Amino acid sequence: MKAILVAGGHGSRMLPFTRYTHKTLLPLYNRPVIDYALATIRRSGISDITIIGNQFIGQIAQHVGTGLPGETIHYVIEEEPLGVHHALNLARPHVEGSRILLYFSDNITTIELTDTVQKFINSKKAPGCALIGRIVEDPERFGIAVFDNNQKLIDIIEKPKNPPSSFAIGGIYIYDESFWNRLDSVVAEKGAKMSISDINRTYVTEGSASIVQSEDSLWIDCGTPDALLEASHLAEQGKLSAKPCNIRKGDEPF
């Protein structure tokens, strides 16, 4: 099992700070944002991680380095944002043939993925996909789940104007090996305008998508200054953790 941490894009919601560094290197209380995202991946048991970044990938590599003992860290540069399919294909050589955890770096959460990851690792047959979701107050910003009367997932609508529910699926996903063929098919049909929801929908249609709900977990999209400030307050209160992470000589007590 391998992970892709997507940390590309311009970080336009974080200007002017992102003119000089990557948004994931901005401070979230006493650690950079990326440490919290990596911690969620690491706690799941995955030790092979590919990080996709923009022109500041060198700064990310300087901070993350070779990772923790026993880890394999790959770095991929997205020189210009050409869509999610382009970014993922840059990481493809490092992960194709493996089941993957796909993690978009703005998502800071206390959800623990260990059990779900282990189920995917241990499954002898293709396990489909696991969609990590939660109830949100602004469903227009997310891929939103559509349920039938029996609460069975039947569709996903990307950023709907009239949301059919408040259950958002976005930012963290777990996929079997068929992900890349599905990506190719969706790109062939929809081109650069495709979204992750389009890929997820292929799993939903065939009944191989499951939902993991973060009912009692914190989950913050740290892509805006206000959200980053909120997350910093939560981390200060001990409600968000960046452990395990690299602690170097000279770092603040942690």
Task: Give the label of every model feature segment.
Residues 1-5, 13-16, 26-27, 31-115, ...:
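Conserved N-terminal catalytic core of the sugar/cofactor nucleotidyltransferase
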Residues 101, 118-121, 152-250:
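Catalytic-core segments of class I nucleotidyltransferases/pyrophosphorylases
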Residues 25, 145-147, 211:
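A structural signal for short hydrophobic beta-strand segments in well-ordered beta-sheet cores
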Residues 111-140:
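Conserved donor-nucleotide/metal-binding helix-loop-beta segment in metal-dependent transferases, i.e.
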Residues 9, 106, 135:
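Active-site glycine-centered loops adjacent to acidic/histidine catalytic or metal-binding residues
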Residues 137, 150-152:
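Ligand/cofactor pocket segment of small-molecule handling proteins
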Residues 54, 76-78, 132, 212-215:
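Conserved beta-strand termini and adjacent loop/short-helix elements that scaffold enzyme active sites
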